[in-house]
Amino acid sequence: YMRMRTGRQVSGSDNIDAGGAAYGHDQIYDHCSFTWGTDECFSLNNDKQPKGLYNITLQNSILGQGCQNHSCGGLVQTSDKEGVTIYLLTIKLVILR
């Protein structure tokens, strides 16, 4: 159970993900929430590492809103040899005014 809320930065890079991985294997992200990233809220990118990024599971988690106009909930960039499993429940949020 982890909550990641990046938020706007006072100094430094404006493109920060709330969570994710650039390399590694056999990782499970379960019951996590990722919001307020200034780039993506959660990203998986093999980052051109020799061993890549594989056997990654994201489940029962929330990918929320980003802080910038270009921010997106998630970004997954892997090669066809790598295994990524994403299991998310889709919930429609209605805001009444």
Q: What kind of feature is each model-predicted range?
A:
Residues 1-6, 23-39, 49-75, 80-97:
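Right-handed parallel beta-helix
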Residues 6-24:
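Extracellular beta-strand-rich solenoid/capping regions of secreted or surface-exposed proteins
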Residues 10-13, 39, 44-47:
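Short, surface-exposed recognition loops or helix-turn segments adjacent to catalytic cores
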